[in-house]
Amino acid sequence: MHGLILAGGEGSRLAAGGIAVPKPLVEVAGRPQIVGLLETFTTLGCSSLTCAVRADFPAVRRLLDGRRFGPPLTVVTCRTPSSLHTLAEGLQGIAAGPVFCSMVDTVMRPEDWEAVYGAAGRYLEEGAELVLAVTPYVDDESPVYVSRHGRDVRAVSDEPLTPVCVTGGVYGLSAAARGAAVDAVARGVHKMRAFLKALVAEGRRVAAVEVPRIIDIDRPSDLQTANAWLAARER
């Protein structure tokens, strides 16, 4: 699978909380978050790496230009209004094939990255069009809830569903899902959650793989929580 990291957001809540560096450069487990994700994707086995990075953050581009990873790395600069738009922008330059995609603010344990990557590859090979990483751990101010039957996603909702299960910002995309994302933006769909809802409503095969905990780094407190969580595991 090709690897894609979406880093097109402004990171306004981090900045408002006093974090001076762009979100992709915040330190998680002792290294810039975007570097950690690229190293993780390399370890997982991605055949290529693409980062869609906000054009307002030249420091991120400079950092990546000075780094070398195993697979070839392409940096796409963008100024997009939503993560769905950033996804569509990033997909445009990726060769044919399935894509393993993460938001830049997603934090998981190494073993959970391996579980999600492995399941995404299997489920896509077995006919799923889109695979979502999900978790019962809710730390988002506006979570996207998922209802499942086995591995299959039956509903995507803004309202809580039982048992509690929310998306975590990590996706496996087939060729069909790649095309659907680009088409959705062309049709005026504005948010990632609206895209996910539409795929399920259309009867597309959307699968989920659950892990115990996923942290989204939106606020300074999230950054502290993520670093404390990962540090505790290493003791």
Where are the predicted features?
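Residues at the starts of beta-strands that form the adenosine-phosphate
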Residues: H2, S47-L49, P72, P98, ...
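Conserved beta-loop-beta/alpha segment of the NTase-like Rossmann-fold superfamily
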Residues: V60-R61, R68-Y145
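Short catalytic helix/loop segments, enriched in acidic residues and glycine
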Residues: A20-V35
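N-terminal nucleotide-binding beta1-loop-alpha1 segment
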Residues: M1-I19
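A short, N-terminal amphipathic alpha-helix
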Residues: R31-S48
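Catalytic-core segments of class I nucleotidyltransferases/pyrophosphorylases
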Residues: E114, L124, D152-R235
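Short internal beta-strands
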Residues: T50-R54, L132-V134
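A conserved acidic beta->alpha catalytic loop
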Residues: D56-P58
